[in-house]
Every structure is written in structure tokens, then in C-alpha cells.
């Protein structure tokens, strides 16, 4: 597990390291500069004899940049130093770096030249930026991006200039980096779009800030790395049988919607409840699955027996929003005492029917919701409408009121969704006492009552294909059936799903991928994680 920090959390770590532990800020700055140069060398970026532009601001990020330029010059780079901003407002450390450079005979320009460079180090703004970029700073960023278009390698110091460290928002304009070297910990803006698209490759460098600098304020954000995967996967007993590794009951499929049922079911040992029209194709595609089909409405006793057999229920993929689906989901929510994953039409049914909403909120075990942005919007609208009606009777908690004050507010919240994702997702998790895996280009996972929030770093745009979410629901259900707790199942499921998508893209390319290719790539990912 790796931490993802907000700007104020990182600032607190810096301050405690300097003032509490006693490591001088200039030492940290020198360590930061060394880490950037090391990152460039590790990636075999040509440096000796190459023209490098250091674009520095007046804050400590600029000081880092000036120190980087000094080190690059020592290994043979032809360095041009450019300092943008009011020189009367230099930070103490940046002023010291300017003095060092002048003592060494370097010139520092106050205006960029139109030369072409082999490399640009972006050190204009760090994680403290909080307003729109205009004027000469905007011109400087545009020139850096132009250098990139001309073929220069762009390395951003800590975060690309112009990106909000907390949300990934662009403050008017931003540097498009090839590599970003983050100091000590990743920041939210590195992992959330659009900032993630501007970050390029992310390298997190140890500059000497210890975890003790958190004191008792442990960061809430975290993500996984590939090297952790083997430890995250549930163990397998050498004397286990087919029932040892979990049994999933899948409520999926409707007329002309058998595909979602098949895609979701490929990841696990399962029993499927689906309309009779899907029997033949499901049996052909998933011969391993146990199957119960029905005409009209499912038999209640048959559903109860299926629930007794299962360890986990997955409901929703392709099941439609008709009366039979409503009755089936209603019965399962009332009767099941299992962890439950609700996806796709299951989520739409929750948003449509107050009874289902109330049953979901009172579910006896773990409830995991996996909405894409459109489904999330419908759930938010339902939550805000419910909140408005409850407020009339003075029954709503203040915390939920603040998240969903009225039905009209849902539109405004979703308009500002990129900047308010964490608040919105946490609010929905609280409303339904659930785990919410909010699918997006950068999926987040939050749980009611839990401070931690998971930031997914795997996956790619080739996964934006019909059925991809059905595969995810099956993966999460399979992990939960093996005994993992709900939050860990959702986090690991999202990460594995993205890794499988990355593997499929590697083999087929983004344009050639289908959801079934993600399924086919899961064994490759698992084999790499557990090669023995």
C-alpha cells in the first residue's frame, strides 16, 4: 500500500521534518534535486552535451529546479537557467540557490529564449498552487509545451505546473510532462484526471521525509503497486476443493442481454439465475456454471435455495429494469445475509424504487456498489430526492444533508464531479451504508465509516467498452467469495481488472480490445503475480 497525499498533508510532513525532526530544508532540497537527476539517468535520458532549460519559479519548487540544473551541469549538460516571477518574493531556499549559482558563475535569465532544447525541467509551480495561471507564467507554460512539441523531453518537479495537487484540475493551463518526479509521496492530482494525463510517467522519490512525519495524521488516500500483488491476493489451500474458493450467485441477464451474464460469470464458480431465454447461450458459454432459469417471475423457494448455496451475491449485469428483475432483487435484498455486489441494472433499479433503496440501506451484510458516472448520477439524484423528503420530516442526519441537500443540487454536484468526486462518493457510501467503487478513468473506492479511500492506478482507455464493468463485478464477487473483506475485495478487484485491461492492451492495442479480452487476460495477470 502506498500513500496518496493532499497538499496540506504534504506541507505538514515537510514542516514537521524540518522543524520537528530537525532536517534542514536545504538538505531536503538537495536530496530532491539528486532524486530528479537519478530518475533521468535511470531512464537513460541523454544528458551529457545536451541543451537543458530550467524553468523555475520563485517558491521552493523553483529552488529545486535551480539545484537540478546545477547538478545537470556537473554531468555535462549545457544548462540555461530561467527564473520567472517577482525576484523580491524569492523563498529563503530559492534565494540561497540563486546565490550558489551566481557564485559558480552561472547567469540566470528573466526571460525565456526561443532556442530549441533537448530537455526542459519544469519547476515553475509546486503543490501549493491554488489559482488560475495568467500573464507571463501562462506564456512560460505555453513555451514549455511548445518545446515538447518540438521534441524536448519535459520533466516536472513534484507536479506539473498548473495542476491542482488535490483534484487534478487544470488552473487555466498546465505543463504536459513526459516524467514527473514526486517527492516523498504521490499526490491526488497525479492520479486524478485531467492531472493524470499531464503527469506522464510518475516516479515517487524518497528525499528523506520519514513516515514518522505523519505523526498521528495518517493520510487517507492510498494505491497499490504491482510488486504488492502477490501479497494482496487471497491464499489458496493445497487441499482445497471447488467449494473452498468461494461460490457466487449471479443475478444477471434478460431478454437479448445474455452477454453481460456471460462476461460477469467468467471469473468465478457460480450459480446463475437468469430468464429462460438465456439458457442455451449461457450453457454453451459457461458450461461450468450451475443454472436456474425462469419464465415470468423466479420461484421464491428456488431463489432461497440458491442463496443458501452461495457465499456472495452479484446482481445487476444485463438483468433489465422490468417487473421480474425488480421482484428478484427485492427478494434477494430482503433475504440474503451475504456480501452483495450490485452493478448495472441493479443500480438503476435501486435509483428507481424507494423500496429497493431502503432494503439496500438495511442489507444485513456488506454491500458493494460499482456505478459508472451515469449510474452514479442516477443514484445521487435518488439520494438527494430521498434526502429532501426525509428533511421534511426532520429525519435526515446533518452530514447527509450537506452531501445531498436537495434534488436540484445533484445536477450541480455532477457538473463539478471531477473536483468533488471524493465528497460525492463518500456521501453515497454513507447514505447506503455501503462500499462504493466509482468506476471512471481513475476509479475511487470508499466505504461508509472508513477514512481510507483507494485510488486506482491501473487500466487504460481501451477498457471503455461495453461489458467491461460486468467483468469487474465478477472479479469483485469472486474475491469476496474467497473470504476477503468487502473493501479489500473492491480495491483489489478494481486494480486487477485494470491490470487485465493493461495486459489486453499490450497484446491487442486499445482499438482492438473488447470486454472479453479483459477476461482472457486475467490468468496472465494472476500468473505474473504468483508465478509458482
PLM region spans:
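Short, small-residue alpha-helix embedded
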Residues: 378, 465-496
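Glycine-rich phosphate/dinucleotide-binding loop and adjoining beta-alpha-beta core of small-molecule
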Residues: 1-5, 45-216, 269-458, 531
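Short, well-structured alpha-helical segments that form the helix of a local strand-helix-strand
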Residues: 421-429, 486-500, 515-523
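Short pre-catalytic strand/loop immediately N-terminal to key active-site residues, enriched for Gly-Thr
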Residues: 20-27, 256, 425, 453-467
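Positively charged, low-complexity intrinsically disordered leader regions
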Residues: 1-48, 205-242
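Radical SAM [4Fe-4S] cluster-binding motif and immediate context
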Residues: 237-295
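Charged C-terminal helix
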Residues: 104, 285, 501-532
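Glycine/serine-rich anion-binding loops at beta->alpha junctions
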Residues: 55-71, 241-244, 252-264, 268, ...
Amino acid at each position: 500500500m502506498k500513500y496518496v497525499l493532499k497538499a496540506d498533508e504534504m506541507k505538514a510532513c515537510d514542516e514537521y521534518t524540518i522543524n520537528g525532526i530537525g532536517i534542514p530544508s536545504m538538505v531536503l532540497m538537495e536530496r530532491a534535486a539528486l532524486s530528479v537527476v537519478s530518475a533521468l539517468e535511470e531512464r537513460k535520458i541523454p544528458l551529457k552535451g545536451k541543451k537543458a532549460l530550467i524553468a523555475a519559479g520563485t517558491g521552493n519548487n523553483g529552488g529545486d529546479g535551480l539545484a537540478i540544473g546545477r547538478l545537470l551541469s556537473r554531468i555535462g549538460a549545457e544548462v540555461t537557467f530561467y527564473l520567472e516571477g517577482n525576484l523580491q518574493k524569492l523563498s529563503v531556499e530559492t534565494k540561497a540557490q540563486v546565490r550558489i549559482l551566481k557564485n559558480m558563475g552561472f547567469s540566470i535569465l528573466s526571460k525565456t529564449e526561443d532556442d530549441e532544447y533537448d530537455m526542459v525541467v519544469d519547476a515553475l509551480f509546486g503543490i501549493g498552487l491554488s489559482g488560475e495561471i495568467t500573464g507571463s507564467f501562462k506564456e512560460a507554460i505555453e513555451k514549455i509545451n511548445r518545446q515538447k512539441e518540438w521534441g524536448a523531453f519535459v520533466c516536472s518537479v513534484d507536479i506539473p505546473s498548473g495542476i491542482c495537487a488535490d483534484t487534478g484540475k487544470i488552473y487555466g493551463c498546465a505543463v504536459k510532462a513526459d516524467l514527473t518526479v514526486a517527492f516523498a509521496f504521490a499526490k491526488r492530482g497525479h492520479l486524478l484526471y485531467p492531472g493524470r494525463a499531464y503527469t506522464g510517467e510518475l516516479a515517487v522519490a524518497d528525499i528523506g521525509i520519514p513516515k514518522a512525519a505523519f505523526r498521528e495524521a495518517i493520510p487517507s488516500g492510498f494505491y497499490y503497486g504491482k510488486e504488492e500483488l502477490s501479497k494482496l491476493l487471497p491464499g489458496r489451500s493445497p487441499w482445497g476443493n471447488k467449494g473452498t474458493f468461494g461460490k457466487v450467485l449471479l443475478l444477471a441477464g434478460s431478454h437479448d442481454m445474455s452477454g453481460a451474464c456471460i462476461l460477469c460469470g467468467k471469473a468465478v464458480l457460480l450459480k446463475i439465475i437468469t430468464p429462460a431465454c438465456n439458457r442455451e447461450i449461457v450453457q454453451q458459454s459457461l458450461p461450468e456454471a450451475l443454472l436456474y432459469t425462469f419464465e415470468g417471475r423466479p420461484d421464491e423457494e428456488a431463489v432461497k435455495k440458491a442463496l443458501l448455496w452461495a457465499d456472495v451475491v452479484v446482481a445487476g449485469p444485463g438483468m433489465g429494469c422490468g417487473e421480474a428483475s425488480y421482484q428478484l432483487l427485492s427478494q434477494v435484498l430482503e433475504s440474503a445475509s451475504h456480501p452483495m455486489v450490485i452493478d448495472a441494472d441493479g443500480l438503476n433499479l435501486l435509483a428507481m424504487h424507494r423500496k429497493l433503496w431502503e432494503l439496500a440501506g438495511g442489507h444485513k451484510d456488506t454491500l458493494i456498489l460499482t456505478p459508472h458516472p451515469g449510474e452514479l448520477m442516477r443514484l445521487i439524484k435518488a439520494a438527494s430526492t430521498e434526502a429532501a423528503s426525509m428533511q421534511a420530516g426532520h429525519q435526515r442526519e446533518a452530514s447527509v444533508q450537506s452531501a445531498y441537500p436537495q434534488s436540484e443540487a445533484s445536477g450541480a454536484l455532477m457538473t463539478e464531479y471531477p473536483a468533488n468526486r471524493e465528497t460525492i462518493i463518500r456521501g453515497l457510501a454513507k447514505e447506503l451504508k455501503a462500499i462504493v467503487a466509482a468506476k471512471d478513468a481513475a476509479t475511487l473506492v470508499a466505504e461508509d465509516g472508513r477514512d481510507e479511500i483507494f485510488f486506482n492506478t491501473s487500466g487504460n482507455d481501451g477498457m471503455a467498452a461495453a461489458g467491461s464493468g460486468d467483468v469487474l463485478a465478477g472479479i469483485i464477487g469472486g474475491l469476496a467469495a474467497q473470504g476477503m473483506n468487502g473493501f479489500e475485495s473492491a480495491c483489489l478487484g478494481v486494480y486487477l481488472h485494470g491490470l487485465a485491461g493493461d495486459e489486453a492492451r499490450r497484446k491487442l492495442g486499445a482499438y482492438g480490445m473488447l470486454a472479453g479480452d479483459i477476461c482472457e487476460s486475467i490468468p496472465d495477470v494472476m500468473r505474473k503475480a504468483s508465478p509458482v
